[in-house]
Amino acid sequence: MINNIIFDNKNRHRIFSILILCLFGFCLVQAMQAPKKNAKKRPQGERVYLLHADELRYDMFSSTPDAQILKGKVSFRHQGSNLTCDSAYFYQGSNSVKAFGHVHYRQGDTLSLICDRAEYDGQMQMMRARKNVVLHHRRQTLNTDSLDFDRLYNVANFFDGGTLIDGKDKLVADWGEYHTETREAKFVYNVKLRSGKDVVTTDTLYYDVLKSMAHMVGPSKIISGGSVVKTEDGYYDTKADKAQLYGRSTVVDKDKTLTGDTLYYVKDGESTGYGNVVYVDKKNKNSLTCNYLRYNEKTGKGFATRNPVAVDYSQKDTLWMHSDTMRIYTFNINTDSVYRKVHAYPKVRAYRQDLQAVCDSLVFNSQDSCMTMYKDPVVWNMNRQLLGEKIMVYMNDSTVRFAHVVGQALSIEQMPDSVHYNQITSNEMKSYFDHGEIKTAESIGNVQTVYFMTDDKDSSLIGLNYLETDTLRMYMGPGRKMEKIWTNKFTSTMYPMTQIPPSKYKLSNFAWFDDIRPKDKNDIFVWRGKAKGTEIKNIKRHEAPLQKITN
């Protein structure tokens, strides 16, 4: 009895396992046979109707025994569409038509297709048109030699070269598809889009007819006037002449190049760049890098921030300049008297091997080629330091022709021993240059000087000359060597090195700011202000005249 019970349990277990396997197999088969969610069901049993033919015949011994042979003004109707042609083979069994000569297919009031020959499958609702195919849909026209139109999905495919015309836009490609319902198209291989005078070339392009928007994928190029845009992922609005470019795109306009991770480019309008933006002007040999840039071609106004760096490489030594924000303004644009102003602020730091500078704000005016530094400006050249309330430097091409320090001017030259300093202070200073070399230096108003004299033989210090006057003019020779001095009324005291009073070594406003001096091009990003108590006296300042800009 126990054996019978065990046998029965084994049988029950075996039967249960078989049932589970059968159920699993049934579910698997059902899953494999389940239709796709997005697939549309092809309607069955809707016949193609022959409306008219001048001649109809049937030949069971011909090469088409199952076809009705039709000639003369042949016309068919199927599910709201009409097909006319010169002659046709009508296959009632398969619910299909082969049409020849002046084939014309119409669907509603918005779609019309003409070709030399076609095959229409009523069962699959598929129209295959060949030779001189022209598809008209609303305002769009598609020309090709081979086109398949799927009525169920409302999509037309061409695969032997085609042209889509949408108003002023003309699209050419080797292969493509056009959705009549959504009015969207896709073009692949040797794609070219002409929109007015603009030309787009790419490998893959998605085109939205309703929005006149082209999406370029892969290496692409837009030629617009004198500008060339290169991108691998871009959107181009043919109506507004603007583009959204992603993935390290570039805009080239003659000698100027703009590159960025993301660029919003507007022809004759405002363009914007985000992420690692690089602007290069090859003609003038300068560049600008930042993480956010905005520029309007119509107004000539620009704005750069998020770590902007301006670089000038027009000279033997390259100049790097950094500030929190940079702006550009253009005046009298589109005239012969056009000029620009560039503003950099705050925390301006600049470095060149032979020149360094810091200030709160800076303005460059191309009208008079003047660069003005405001609020605690300091300029260094080799072992010399110059500071004041405002420093103006006038350029001749890329070389200095005139420098003007206004208010609390102080010029210091560090001696070779790094202990003693030649010093001049006055209300203002003027320096005149010839081919970049200083020729004349003039100090005006409350002039005080501390000058250490040296031995001509070994350059050792032999004494100190302290001088006070109203005006002092120095004439320089080659190598910035002083040749002569002119002054009017003055008082002067000469001290031997062993008899110099401690108070005469340095002027009362002496300050040596070597600790805030930029050391190299990477040091321009680290702002170091003057130590407390060393700032210029708190009097009425010369403020940078910033123009307003609409954000």
Please report, for each region that a protein language model flagged, where it lies by residue.
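Bacterial Sec-dependent N-terminal signal peptides
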Residues: M1-A39, T550-N551
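N-terminal amphipathic/hydrophobic interface segments
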Residues: A31-N551
